[in-house]
């Protein structure tokens, strides 16, 4: 069997969004399950719009998702001499020709065709004319066959046939000599021995054109697979308001790479009713031919559900570094406070993203200087001073700082003062966290630590006394 070689070829003219990542994932999975190679290529011939920042973001996004590549990144901007060489080869073999048509003529031609309800296309005006000896500007067009059809078996869509009469003579070199997209892609796939081109279905109209150029070069054709687009929940093309943002924004919002990978593989592909896939299962089970031909709808709630699943199931050690980043972004000093792994284990059931987890965990690492106004009015009352004082004294005298012992102190104090457990736990929670939401109060006290907990209880008692005065 021929050695499988796939590629991902983004343009660095913007961010790497989830549609591009899904295409990269499918291509990467196909290579991995066939013991093949996954090649990364940066299509940066659009010098005006390509930026190094975009290149860096693409590489960083792929690394975050652990979509690793065997070769590259190759840069088209470094291969210009090779493209010119192939263009010259096509001209010499009479598979390409100079076109001197002015912009005005082409605009007039297009308007006439539209007026006559015809498909806008080049009419071949320069196709059979000899090259001029003047210094007039020209482009180079590929001499597309006028008979027959381009037929190929798409890995996802099955057999596709395009009549050559539907295709005009596309430009392969601009008037400044620069190669166009359809030429560079063909040369790269040929030179890099790509066996399977898996890409978005927005490229499907380019495929017959590229196949004809490959035929003219005497090159072996790769297999093609065109992945349907991702739509928003409203059925419209995915936009920023739906979630078509940089993949790194998902990282910054506290999503886990495992969750995003799992979500994207299920967008348009299924394996029975299975929802959760490990990376190993993805490689083993993914089937490119089983990808749906219909567009997939992006569901942010499903992604959140998956993210929470992974927060609960991934080892806290694995996500501790990302959690630390979120806490530091929130302005927290991590030198004081419990271990990150302990907080993750405690908060994973209660939060859906690492960012939310960090926002809800700040009180573990910084003193509480103020209270939510509504929470303080409801729970930090004069009637609770004595029970709080009792809790403070009992906690201070515990021989060891253990959750079970802490729990006993709260239960016994509530019974002593004829309070329901919640009537005592909520004021303690407000004193410790500044608000009414936290994990179980014994676990919260345990992680905050004895010294800090006692200080916070003292602060709350003073706060109540000041209010009484």
Swiss-Prot record:
Could you tell me the keywords of this UniProt record?
A: Aminoacyl-tRNA synthetase, ATP-binding, Cytoplasm, Ligase, Metal-binding, Nucleotide-binding, Protein biosynthesis, Zinc
One GO biological-process annotation of the entry reads: glutamyl-tRNA aminoacylation
EC number(s) reported in the record: 6.1.1.17
> Where does this protein chiefly localize?
cytoplasm
Give the enzyme's main class according to its UniProt record, as a single word: ligase
Q: Which residues bind Zn(2+)?
A: 99, 101, 126, 128
PROSITE patterns assigned to the protein according to its UniProt record, in alphabetical order:
AA_TRNA_LIGASE_I
* Entries under SUPFAM superfamilies matching the protein: An anticodon-binding domain of class I aminoacyl-tRNA synthetases, Nucleotidylyl transferase
Q: Which residues bind ATP?
A: 240
> What chemistry does it catalyse, as a reaction equation?
tRNA(Glu) + L-glutamate + ATP = L-glutamyl-tRNA(Glu) + AMP + diphosphate
Which cofactors, by name? Zn(2+)
What Pfam families does UniProt report for this protein, alphabetically? Anticodon_2, tRNA-synt_1c
InterPro entries registered for this protein in UniProt: aa-tRNA-synth_I_cd-bd, aa-tRNA-synth_I_codon-bd_sub2, aa-tRNA-synth_I_CS, aa_tRNA-synth_I_cd-bd_sf, Glu-tRNA-ligase_bac/mito, Glu/Gln-tRNA-synth, Glu/Gln-tRNA-synth_Ib_cat-dom, GluQ/Sye
Q: Does the keyword Nucleotide-binding belong to this entry?
A: yes
Q: Which family does it belong to?
A: Belongs to the class-I aminoacyl-tRNA synthetase family. Glutamate--tRNA ligase type 1 subfamily.
State the protein's name. Answer: Glutamate--tRNA ligase 1
Q: Which organism is it from?
A: Coxiella burnetii (strain RSA 331 / Henzerling II)
